[in-house]
UniProtKB/Swiss-Prot annotation:
Subunit-structure text: Monomer.
Sample GO molecular function, one term: arginine-tRNA ligase activity
Designated gene of the protein: argS
E.C. code: 6.1.1.19
Family per similarity comment: Belongs to the class-I aminoacyl-tRNA synthetase family.
Protein name, per record: Arginine--tRNA ligase
One protein family per Pfam: Arg_tRNA_synt_N
Subcellular location: Cytoplasm
Source organism of the structure: Salmonella heidelberg (strain SL476)
C-alpha cells in the first residue's frame, strides 16, 4: 500500500475540482514533524500563483472538495497554505492487518520493466580492491530493490577484459607455463600483473612479443583466445569468492565484458561517419559535440577511433548502450560508476542519442558515487600507501567482528560465533557505505561501523533480534494472533504503524533514485519508533489479551519490515546476538 500515492490522487482530484489545471502537482510529502500530521500537501503555493489567488484561499477551496473519510481523522490548513493530514487510527489498523496478511507486506507491483544495471566492473588479471566496493554493493542494493518490486533486472558486470595489456599478460602467462609455474603465478593475480608489467618495461624482446600477441588476439587466433579466456576465467573465479563473501547476487552469468562489444565497433564508426556525426581529424575519427566546449570555447572533439585504428572506451560505451537497448530490450539503464566518469558517459550518451541508437524514452542514468576516504580525509590506502585489497578488508572486518561477538557472547559455540561474526562484520562494511548518500565521499571508520549505537549494521541487526525476543518470551497462540484485530489507541502505536506503512514509499524512492541510504534511514527510524513503543506500550503485560495481541501484531510487522528492508540492502539478519 502506497499511502502517499493514495493521498496524492485524492488531493489532486480536489485541486482540479477547485479550479487547478489537470496536470497540477499536489506535492504530498511525509510530514517532518508529528505536529504537522502524517502527511502534508505543499502544492498550493505553485498552483495558486498560476491562478492568481492566495495559497491559503486555494487550500480552503480544496478542503471543501477533499474527501478523506475513512482515511484521515483530521485535515487542517497551516501557514501560508500547507494542508496537514492526520491519518485515522482505524485506517492504520486495517492497513497493518493487510500488510501482515501478505508475504510482500502489502507492497504493490508497478508496471514491470526490463532494467539493465551496470555495476561492479572489476578488471581481468587484477584483484578487486576497495575502489570496487561502492559500485558493487550500491548496485546490488538497487538490483535487489528493483527485483523485489517485480521488475525484470539484467545485471551487467562490465568487466575490463580487453585492451592492449592482454598481449603482455598472455606473453607472461606463456612464459610461466613454459617454466611449469603458470597456475602458481595466477594464484597471486596482483603479483602476476606486476611481474608482467615489469618485464614489459624492462625487456624489449618481451615487449615486442607482447605487441604481436595483441594483434593476434584481436584477429581472433584460437590459441591466443584460449590463453585470454584462461586469464578471464581465473579472475572471475577469484572475484566470485569475493561476491559470495559480500552477499552480492552477481554470478559468472552476469559478466558482459568490454570484449562483448568488439564486433560492433567498426560498424558503429562507419555508421557515425555515414550519418555525418563523425569526421576525420588529424588521422583520427572524431565526433565534435556542441554540448561540450573545450578551453577555447569550441565544440569538444570526442575521438572514437585512433590514428592507428584502435578504439577507445567511448566507442565501447556507445556500443554498450546500443546493445542494451537493441538486444537486451532495456526500458531503463542504470550505471553505478564513480563520479569521475560523468563527463565521459555524458559524451558517449550524447552521441548515442544523436545517432538514434537509444530513444529519449529510454533513460540512461548515471548513478554516480563519491570516494571512500580514510580518517585523514584522503583516499583510503594501506599504511604503506598502497591500494587496499577487498579480500583483505573483508578479512579484517571478520576478525574485528569475531572479537566483538566473542566479548558479548563468551560461551557461544564456535560455529555459531563464526556465522554471527560473518553477518556482523560483512554487514557493517556494507551498511556503513549504503547508509551514506552515494553522491558524497565518506570516511571509512572501523569503530563507527561496528558500534552498537547509531545508524549501523550491528545496531539494526540487534534491533531485529530485540523484536524477535518479544516472541520468544511470549506464549503465543499463532491461530488466535492471526485472527486478532489490530487496535490503535496510543500515539506511539499510531506513529509506529504509520511509519511501518511507509515501506512501499521508501522502496519506490530507492528504485527511482538509486539511493539505498533512504532505506537505511527509514529502517533506523522504524527501529527507534519501535524502541519508544516498546518502552511506553507494554506488550506482554498489556492490560488485556486484545491489546496484547494487537501490540504483538505491530511487533510482528516491525520484525518483518526490518528483515525485508535489510534484505533489499543485502544485509543479513540474525536470530540472536
Amino acid at each position: 500500500m502506497n499511502i502517499q500515492a493514495l493521498l496524492s490522487e485524492k488531493v489532486s482530484q480536489a485541486m482540479i475540482a477547485a479550479g487547478a489545471p489537470a496536470d497540477c502537482e499536489p506535492q504530498v510529502r511525509q510530514s517532518a514533524k508529528v505536529q504537522f500530521g502524517d502527511y502534508q500537501a505543499n502544492g498550493m503555493m505553485a498552483v495558486a500563483k498560476k491562478l492568481g489567488m492566495a495559497p491559503r484561499q486555494l487550500a480552503e477551496q480544496v478542503l471543501t472538495h477533499l474527501d478523506l473519510s475513512g482515511i484521515a481523522s483530521k485535515v487542517e490548513i497551516a501557514g501560508p497554505g500547507f494542508i496537514n493530514i492526520f491519518l485515522e487510527p482505524a485506517f492504520l489498523a486495517e492497513q497493518v492487518q493487510q500488510a501482515l496478511a501478505s508475504d510482500r507486506l502489502g507492497v504493490s507491483q508497478p508496471t514491470r520493466q526490463t532494467i539493465v544495471v551496470d555495476y561492479s566492473a572489476p578488471n581481468v588479471a587484477k584483484e578487486m580492491h576497495v575502489g570496487h566496493l561502492r559500485s558493487t554493493i550500491i548496485g546490488d542494493a538497487a538490483v535487489r530493490t528493483l527485483e523485489f518490486l517485480g521488475h525484470h533486472v539484467i545485471r551487467a558486470n562490465h568487466v575490463g577484459d580487453w585492451g592492449t595489456q592482454f598481449g603482455m599478460l598472455i606473453a607472461w602467462l606463456e612464459k610461466q607455463q613454459q617454466e611449469n609455474a603458470g597456475d602458481m603465478a595466477l594464484a597471486d593475480l596482483e603479483g602476476f600483473y606486476r611481474d608482467a608489467k615489469k618485464h614489459y618495461d624492462e625487456d624489449e624482446a618481451f615487449a615486442e612479443r607482447a605487441r604481436n600477441y595483441v594483434v593476434k588476439l584481436q584477429s581472433g587466433d584460437a590459441y591466443f583466445r584460449e590463453m585470454w579466456r584462461k586469464l578471464v576465467d581465473i579472475t572471475m573465479t577469484q572475484n566470485q569468492i569475493t561476491y559470495d563473501r559480500l552477499n552480492v547476487t552477481l554470478t559468472r552469468d552476469d559478466v558482459m565484458g568490454e570484449s562483448l562489444y568488439n564486433p560492433m565497433l567498426p560498424g558503429i564508426v562507419a555508421d557515425l561517419k555515414a550519418k555525418g556525426l563523425a569526421v576525420e581529424s588529424e588521422g583520427a575519427t572524431v565526433v565534435f559535440l556542441d554540448e561540450f566546449k573545450n578551453k577555447e570555447g569550441d565544440p569538444m572533439g570526442v575521438i572514437i577511433q585512433k590514428k592507428d585504428g584502435g578504439y577507445l572506451y567511448t566507442t565501447t560505451d556507445i556500443a554498450c548502450a546500443k546493445y542494451r537497448y537493441e538486444t537486451l530490450h532495456a526500458d531503463r539503464v542504470l550505471y553505478y560508476i564513480d563520479s569521475r566518469q560523468h563527463q565521459h558517459l555524458m559524451q558517449a550518451w550524447t552521441i548515442v542519442r544523436k545517432a538514434g541508437y537509444v530513444p529519449d524514452s529510454v533513460p540512461l542514468e548515471h548513478h554516480m558515487f563519491g570516494m571512500m576516504l580514510g580518517k585523514d580525509g584522503k583516499p583510503f590506502k594501506t599504511r604503506a600507501g598502497g591500494t587496499v585489497k577487498l579480500a583483505d578488508l573483508l578479512d579484517e572486518a571478520l576478525e574485528r567482528a569475531r572479537r566483538l561477538v566473542a566479548e558479548k557472547n563468551p560461551d557461544m559455540p564456535a560455529d555459531e560465533l563464526e556465522k554471527l561474526a560473518n553477518a556482523v562484520g560483512i554487514g557493517a562494511v556494507k551498511y556503513a557505505d549504503l547508509s551514506k548518500n552515494r553522491t558524497t565521499d565518506y570516511i571509512f571508520d572501523w569503530d563507527n561501523m561496528l558500534a552498537f549505537e547509531g545508524n549501523t549494521a550491528p545496531y539494526m541487526q540487534y534491533a531485529y533480534t530485540r523484536v524477535l525476543s518479544v516472541f520468544r518470551k511470549a506464549d503465543i497462540d499463532e491461530q488466535a494472533l492471526a485472527s486478532a484485530p489490530v487496535i490503535i489507541s496510543e500515539d506511539r502505536e499510531a506513529q509506529l504503524a504509520a511509519r511501518l506503512l511507509q515501506f512501499e514509499e521508501t522502496l519506490t524512492v530507492v528504485a527511482r533514485e538509486g539511493t539505498p541510504h533512504v532505506m537505511c534511514a527509514y529502517l533506523y527510524d522504524v527501529a527507534g519508533l519501535f524502541s519508544g513503543f516498546y518502552e511506553h506500550c507494554p506488550i506482554l503485560s498489556a492490560e488485556n489479551d486484545a491489546v496484547r495481541n494487537s501490540r504483538l501484531k505491530l511487533a510482528q510487522l516491525t520484525a518483518k519490515t526490518l528483515k525485508l528492508g535489510l534484505d533489499t540492502l543485502g544485509i543479513e539478519t540474525v536470530e540472536r546476538m
